[in-house]
Amino acid sequence: MIETNKKASWSELCPDVLRCVFELLSFSDLNRTRSVCSSWHSASRHCVPTQNQIPWLILFPRNNVNNNNNNSCVLFVPDDRDSLYKTKDLGVGFMLSNCLATYGSWILMMDRLCNLNILNPLTGEKIDLPRTKFDLPRLESSVACLWIDEKTKDYIVVWKIKNSLVYAKKGNHTWQQVFSMNEELSVEQIVYEHKTQKLYVHFNDSTLSIWRLSREDPHGVFENYIPFDFVFQDFLPDRRTDEELYVKEYIDTRLNIALTTSGELLKVASVVQKSKRWLFRIYKMNYIKRRWERIESLGDEALILDMGITIVAKDIPGLKRNSIYISGFDYGRKHLDHIFIFDLTTQESEPLPYCVSSSNDFSDARWFFPSFSQSPY
């Protein structure tokens, strides 16, 4: 046997071995391997990252004279806090559109004529939805929700348009009506749960309507959720001493709904103050006492407030358990001070890193969950 003193070099590892390892890495870790050396860069080229379990933040381009025809989105990946990524050019029509909702890798967009489409910003794949038959004014925003199967591209979009709630599924050529409402009632939020095919509709009077979309004709489902409301005093540690200061600082309140991983319904009350501070209270229904009761913790879950869902967050790098991921509603979509992760344990907000906060030229922001069926490189 001939012995050799030559040391093995990690840059000379077999490409097949490298690919076996790379396929186990997250998007961020896989991206880091590409900068190690040319052989690792080559081996990683056709690798697909492992299934993504953390929300990414997508920042949409602003439509103004200083935009320099930038029709791409900026992506922030929480487990890679020092870097930003950019999508491909998504076209002028994209820059002139507004995002209404996200699901998985997909975003629901509304163009200037109030027509909707579903877009994958990572691949550029686009699904046009039925044209609207209504004479609509130019809408800057609207209430909608999205569900889509990443493989089959089956989808459901539910949209509040004028005084009606309508939906479209894959194969539909027109929008179908769920229900109509009087002008005094306004839809604040829509959450769809595909396992049960239930649609949760939250109104501005804090009431809730539940519908099942499993048939051709949607039908209402009775569930005994009593109306819920809150007053600003609920947020005061000491009502006698704190009320005056609170009123001076107060900007607005918001009430959201969310579904946990086990299917429980939560109500999330929030307050934003002039100091850019946010306060949160989370409640769930006590059916025995017939009242909403505050819960102090989400446990090993995290709440994505944009989407109205919680996700499992235990032992997942880059994902904070017992936290709320928020993109600021109407306040934060153009102000990075209101896009953050709120830690329910410490009651403190974790701001975005400098690489994101220095990206001022954006019009909107959303959390979403991209996945990869092919190499992103």
UniProtKB/Swiss-Prot annotation:
It holds the Pfam family Beta-prop_KIB1-4. This is F-box protein At2g05970. Residues 8-55 form the F-box domain. CDD domains: F-box_SF. The lineage of its organism: Eukaryota, Viridiplantae, Streptophyta, Embryophyta, Tracheophyta.
